[in-house]
Each structure stands twice: as structure tokens, then as C-alpha cells.
């Protein structure tokens, strides 16, 4: 049963959305009865609404056209500036990207508008892996908005040059057969190498929103035996056509031999697909390299019915770990916890333990402005955020590192209020364990008032590296340079104007990417990006992906990947691209 506070919040948001007539598509979750019913106090327990997840609008072009045709008032509509001066045309605000940072996207494509302007297709939400048998073979992935496909990007020179591969057979547009012939890409791409480096697994979501409200969704896996250059057709791991549940946020890992594990969140939406009853973390496994899969098993326990954002990994001793964000039964599900599920019998059973408080309450963040999803965001930003964990297990020592970002200590966070008051100051937290049973106390590894979000972690050869976005380097906008400021659409004139609120008009909103490592006990922040870039560039600033990636190779060197908003200066105008930093 959904707690009363959840239901009350659902009703209020649904009523407000109906009054505004919001139908923004792709990243606005245009299933108001379904998605908004899940938009309760615990914002981790919301279907992600990522790539392609929409009834009506599946592409950035459709999103832009809907926004321009149905603008909100100037103080509410945050408009994508990939087609607005000074972000339009071929002139870039940014200098070329240089080593040790490289653009993983090759031959990006653009889509045009009736007025002659255009935008380049975005890529966001990345995962990255290093071949354990060949540190030069680096592979990453992202939500790919070129032609409704699943895609990976592989390198054979340590991340300096890249090849882009569209995976065959996942969707109707990529030659899908059988069930896949009427499905679309729903994002959440994840990669995992087998311990010997011989097999590379890719997992992702597929769905069909044409059947709303009984939305169809599935999770599938494909395999590469040549480091990502070519791929098998996908195998469906879990799919039902009832629409009574929605699969979301899957994660894949590989164990010794041909063992593969896949976890995800299963949102139970009721017999008509319009509610939100619970969201357990579940798992399926394969013992033949992903050809066949077991039945679905529970990972989270009955005490934790509302969960999201799982990551699964195998320790050197064969123990299986699943980290996720779950609501805390001790507080009536009013607060959140980092939960770690441990299995020593190959996933037959799990022991779930609450490891750390996660400060992700209803009163810990402002909400997105109307026109987006009503999700948590940062002060003066518009992209949705979360506190899902990122986990890595060192294959040489068995040490486990888990990171996340939350807003502890900011404003009235944790006061029990229904709304946030103050200024966000998100920070990255770290917990570690040598045995999977005993855990360190949460440690805040970042400092300063500027927000840090979407942390990811990699561990190998005794070294831990953590990457994250930071607002610490963003210049403030000026009268002559708005590149790191907010622009809004005047619904009367159609012009882009400054916010009327002085605080928003002067807000510095650009992001950078930074890393810290255990080499100096995480004391030093290394700025990876050479220029700050503006996240409002695509999707009206409402979506930059729900996770990032960091990995450490056997040589102790790290690669890290994030959504950057510069595009590829000199080749494309500003847009969302997957950039990879190497050699850290």
C-alpha cells in the first residue's frame, strides 16, 4: 500500500499538471496518470522517463516543436538554446576539445526546423568499461537519439579515437524481429566485460508507448566477442505485454565463466497501468553467456517496497552485491537509505542492509519549473537529479566503493517540510567496505557551496577514482556574455529574454566535470573540462542523463565519461555529446 503522504503528493501534482495542460513528451513523461501517480515524495521511485519514453514525442525535434507550439509564460518556459542565438548556427562559443579529453561521438547528425535552423542530435547518460585483458580497449555507451537506436562507442587506443556502432535488432527501426519489431529504444544503456575480457555485454530498455496506458516495456541484453565492434541480436530477459508494470534502470555485470547478472526496478502500476503500488529491485541471471535467462527473482526485501537505481557487481570471491536507493521503513518511508543486498549463493537469496542515510527527501531540493516533469533539481537549474548509488568492486582486492550525491545540510533539507527552502549545495558521499559486511561511515569527499551531482566511481589495482559534475567553475553571466546564464521564451513575442527574477537572471548555471582519487585520499579535485558549458542547451535543460561513468584499468589509470554541452567545437554547434577523459 502506498503511504498516505505518497498518495497526497501524487494527487496534488496530478491536479497541477492537469491545470497547466502539460504534454511536453519525451522527457516530460506524457503519461500524466501513470508517471505523475509515481511522482510522490520519494522521487527515487519514479520511472526514469529517459530516451524514447513518451506516448507522443520521441525525439528532440518533436520536443522542440511541442515547446515552441505550446509555450508557457516567460517566467516558466525554459527554452532549449541549441536553436536560439547565440547557440544557433555554426559559430561555437567554445574552443576545440583537446587531449586528454576526447569526443566519443562520430558523424553526429542534425535535424532541421521549418524556420531553417537546426539542432544536433544529443547523446546523454553514459556508462564506461575497460577490457580487463586489454586496457587500450575502452567502450562507452549513451542514450542515442540518432534514429531510435541503441548504440555503443568503442576505442582500441585507450580512448583517443572512437568508432560508433548501432546495435542491430533492438527496435523496429534497427531491424528488430519478433517482439522487437514493434518496440522502441527506451535508453538506460549499460556495459560489462567478462572477467577474462572475452565477452562484452550490453543491456538496455525497450518499450512501446503506443499502448498507453498499458505501456509495454522490456529489458534485453546483447553480446560482443570482439571488444564492441560487432554485436549479437538482443535476447529479451523480461517482457510482458500486460502493461501492469514498467521496467526501469537496469544494470548488468558478469562473473567467471559465462555467468551474467541483470538487475532492474520493476514498477508495479496496478491492473490498468495507472497507479504506483511498489517498485522492488529484481534480478535475472544467465549461465550461458546471455543466451538464456532465469526467471525473475526478488533482490530487495519486503521491508523496502519503494526503490530505484540499482547497480550490481561481482566480487572476486563470487559474492554478488546490489546497491540501490530505497525508502526507509523506520521513518514510514519519509526518508531514503543506501541499501546493499548481498548474496553468497549466486543470487538465490539476498541479505539487504541499510548502509547510509541518503538526504534525498522531498524538502531537500527545489522542483523543476512547469514544462518539465516536476522532479527534483538544483537551485536555478532545470535538469532532474537523483541520489542513486554508483558502485565498483576492485577485482584485485575485493574492496567495494559506493558513491552518491545528496543535499545534506542545505536549506531546510531533512526538516520534514513539504517543500525545499534555501539554496542547494549537493555534495558527493563515499562509503567503502573490505568484506561487504562492514562499512565505513559516509564520508563527504567534496567541499564548497557549489553543487556536485551524478557521481560515478571506478576501482582497480587498489585505486579508487570518482568523477562528478560541479558548478564550482561556472562564470556568472554578464550583460554581454550570457553563455552561462538562463534565457527564457517570451510567449507573447517569441523572443528569448532574460528572466525577470534577478536571482535567476544572474545565476551561473554551467557545469564542469572533475575527478578525485584515493591516490591522495581524495584531497585534490582535478578539473577535467577546460571550459564550463550550459546544460540548458537541449531538452529545455530538463534532462542530461541519469548517470555517468568512471572506470579504472589494471594499470591503475582511469577513464571517465559524462554528458558535455559544448558539442564538438569546430565541427558542430553546442549540443549534448559524450566526452571521455583519459589517463587520470
Question: What do these predicted regions represent?
Answer:
Residues 28-42:
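Signal peptide processing junction and immediate N-terminal pro/mature segment
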Amino acid at each position: 500500500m502506498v503511504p498516505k503522504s505518497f498518495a497526497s503528493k501524487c494527487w496534488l501534482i496530478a491536479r497541477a499538471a492537469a491545470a497547466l495542460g502539460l504534454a511536453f513528451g519525451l522527457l516530460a513523461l506524457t503519461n500524466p496518470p501513470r508517471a505523475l501517480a509515481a511522482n510522490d515524495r520519494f522521487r527515487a521511485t519514479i520511472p526514469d522517463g529517459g530516451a524514447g519514453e513518451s506516448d507522443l514525442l520521441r525525439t528532440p525535434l518533436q520536443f522542440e516543436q511541442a515547446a515552441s507550439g505550446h509555450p508557457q509564460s516567460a517566467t516558466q518556459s525554459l527554452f532549449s538554446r541549441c536553436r536560439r542565438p547565440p547557440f544557433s548556427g555554426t559559430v561555437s562559443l567554445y574552443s576545440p576539445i583537446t587531449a586528454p579529453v576526447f569526443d566519443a561521438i562520430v558523424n553526429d547528425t542534425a535535424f532541421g526546423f521549418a524556420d531553417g535552423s537546426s539542432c544536433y542530435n544529443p547523446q546523454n547518460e553514459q556508462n564506461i568499461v575497460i577490457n580487463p585483458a586489454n586496457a587500450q580497449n575502452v567502450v562507452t555507451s549513451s542514450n542515442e537519439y540518432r534514429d531510435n537506436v541503441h548504440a555503443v562507442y568503442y576505442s582500441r587506443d585507450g580512448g583517443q579515437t572512437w568508432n560508433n556502432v548501432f546495435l542491430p535488432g533492438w527496435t523496429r527501426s534497427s531491424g528488430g524481429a519478433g517482439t522487437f519489431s514493434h518496440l522502441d529504444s527506451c535508453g538506460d544503456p549499460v556495459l560489462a566485460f567478462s572477467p577474462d575480457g572475452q565477452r562484452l555485454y550490453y543491456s538496455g530498455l525497450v518499450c512501446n508507448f503506443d499502448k498507453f496506458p498499458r505501456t509495454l516495456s522490456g529489458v534485453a541484453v546483447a553480446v560482443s566477442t570482439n571488444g564492441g565492434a560487432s554485436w549479437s541480436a538482443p535476447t529479451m530477459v523480461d517482457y510482458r505485454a500486460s502493461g501492469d508494470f514498467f521496467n526501469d534502470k537496469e544494470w548488468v555485470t558478469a562473473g567467471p565463466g559465462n555467468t551474467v547478472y541483470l538487475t532492474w526496478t520493476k514498477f508495479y502500476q496496478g491492473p490498468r497501468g495507472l497507479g504506483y503500488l511498489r517498485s522492488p529491485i529484481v534480478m535475472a541471471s544467465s549461465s550461458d553467456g546471455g543466451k538464456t535467462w532465469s526467471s525473475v527473482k526478488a533482490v530487495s526485501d519486503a521491508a523496502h517496497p519503494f526503490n530505484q537505481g540499482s547497480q550490481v557487481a561481482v566480487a572476486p570471491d563470487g559474492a554478488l552485491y546490489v546497491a540501490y536507493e530505497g525508502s526507509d521503513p523506520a521513518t514510514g518511508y519519509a526518508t531514503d537509505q543506501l541499501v546493499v543486498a548481498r548474496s553468497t549463493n549466486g543470487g538465490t537469496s539476498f541479505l539487504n542492509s541499510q548502509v547510509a542515510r541518503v538526504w534525498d527527501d522531498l524538502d531537500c531540493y527545489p522542483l523543476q519549473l512547469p514544462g518539465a516533469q516536476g522532479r527534483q533539481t538544483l537551485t536555478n537549474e532545470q535538469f532532474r537529479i537523483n541520489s542513486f548509488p554508483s558502485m565498483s568492486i576492485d577485482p584485485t582486492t575485493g574492496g567495494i566503493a559506493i558513491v552518491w550525491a545528496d543535499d545534506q545540510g542545505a536549506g531546510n533539507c531533512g526538516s520534514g517540510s513539504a517543500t525545499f527552502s534555501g539554496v542547494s549545495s549537493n555534495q558527493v558521499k563515499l562509503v567503502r567496505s573490505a568484506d561487504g559486511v562492514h562499512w565505513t561511515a559516509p564520508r563527504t569527499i567534496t567541499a564548497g557551496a557549489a553543487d556536485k551531482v551524478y557521481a560515478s566511481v571506478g576501482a582497480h589495482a587498489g585505486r579508487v577514482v570518482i568523477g562528478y559534475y560541479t558548478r564550482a567553475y561556472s562564470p556568472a553571466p554578464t550583460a554581454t556574455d550570457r553563455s552561462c546564464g538562463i534565457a527564457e521564451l517570451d510567449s507573447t513575442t517569441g523572443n528569448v529574454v532574460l528572466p525577470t527574477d534577478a536571482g535567476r537572471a544572474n545565476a551561473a548555471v554551467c557545469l564542469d566535470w572533475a575527478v578525485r582519487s584515493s591516490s591522495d585520499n581524495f584531497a585534490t579535485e582535478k578539473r577535467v573540462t577546460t571550459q564550463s558549458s550550459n546544460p540548458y542547451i537541449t531538452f529545455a535543460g530538463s534532462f542530461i542523463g541519469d548517470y555517468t561513468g568512471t572506470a579504472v584499468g589494471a594499470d591503475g589509470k582511469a577513464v571517465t565519461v559524462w554528458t558535455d554541452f559544448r558539442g564538438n567545437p569546430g565541427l558542430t554547434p553546442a549540443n549534448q555529446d559524450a566526452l571521455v577523459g583519459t589517463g587520470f
